[in-house]
Each structure stands twice: as structure tokens, then as C-alpha cells.
Amino acid sequence: MHRPALMRSALGVAMMTILVLTLTACGGGGSAREEKANKVHRIPEDAQTYEGEPLPAGPYATDEFTPAMSFDLAKGWTRGGTELPDIWDLRDIENDAFWVVFSNADEVYDPKGSKRVKIASPPEDMVGWLRSNPHLKTEEPEPTSVGDEKGVRFDALVSGAVETPLCPGCVDLPLFRYSDGESAGVEKGEKIRFIVVNDVKGETVTIFVESSPQGFEEFLPKAERVIDSVKWGGS
């Protein structure tokens, strides 16, 4: 029996064991990182906890909004209001006047014909209805697509406000009324990119990118990256 030979054998086994454990640990870490990167996030529901907090970058899917959809977020976004079947929205974390809104409202506000806006059913021609609003100075519409569904896009300046606001502190120009009784609209002086997708699983989806005229060209590409990543049907 040669002790040195036995020692080399034992050391060799020990080193192989350490190497296997190290590789296993590294492999496990990689899997964990991949799993974290591929995790599908949801828009947080708790407004008090998540108001103004950054949303993690990565893939997302809606829980409530109809039609269901998935999308990707980079860093720099925070949640807007509570996700509902007929609206969800995002806000630029560095500027609370920069928004992306996805809407499928069953009611709209008609600003024409009286001092006070009236609640009405959504129009069949959403593009025509928006462009006919006396407080929106709109550009010519262009064809576009979102999630492989055809739509129309056009830009607008908010040139005025309704004579009688819905409430003190409410938006200057209310457009949509939602299932929770709240309204969404735009403010006088803003620049808006409207995108209307007419038939997403039988639903009309109106997307609007909202910002100041000065910040529009800078914010629009960031908003478009979210919109361009949309896939209808969720995840």
C-alpha cells in the first residue's frame, strides 16, 4: 500500500466533487436568472403601495382589461389607475403629465350641443367622433397596426375645454366614462397621439399617448415601444 497514491486518489475525488457542486450551483443561478427575466408581471392593484413606484422591466399581461393583452415594459414606468375591464394606463415615472392609456369604454362624453357634456353610447366610428370634437385640432389619419390588428392613428392638439367641467379638478376635456364611474380625458394645451383599433376580438380599443407639445417628440418613442410590443390574447 502506497499512502501517497491513496492521498492523490482521495484528493482527486474531492476536487471532482467540488467541481460538480460548483457547476451545479452556477447552472442553478443561471436558471433562476432566466426564470426571473421571463416572469410575466401584472399591473399592481394596490394604489397606495405602488403609487409612483417603478414597475419592474419585463413582460406583462393584463388581468382585467378586455380584450386581454400582453406587452413589454422597459424601465421608467409606473402604474396609473386601477386596471379595469375598460381601461388601464401607464405613466412616465419622471413626468406625471406623460401617459399611455388603453381604453375600451362603453360610454363617452359628447361635448356638443349644450354647456354641460352628456353621457352617450360609444360611436361606431371612433376616429370620426374624435376628429369631430370641437376642442381637438386633429391631423390627417394614417393607417397603422397594433398587435397585427389594423387601425388608424392621428395626432391632435387640445385647443379648448368644455364650458362646464364635470367636477372641480376634473380634466378639461372628458372623453370616456368607465365602469367605476370615473372619467378619462385630456387637458387643454396637450398634444395627443390617438390610435384606434376597430376589431380586436370584436372590441374597439382606443389608445392615446398624452404629453405636453414640448415633450411629445421625446416621449412618443418610449410610448411606441410599449404599443409595438402588444400582443392580443394575454399570456
Annotated model-derived regions:
Residues 1-7, 116, 155:
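Short intrinsically disordered, low-complexity coil segments enriched in acidic
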Residues 2-107, 186-190, 196-235:
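N-terminal targeting sequences that direct proteins away from the cytosol to non-cytosolic compartments
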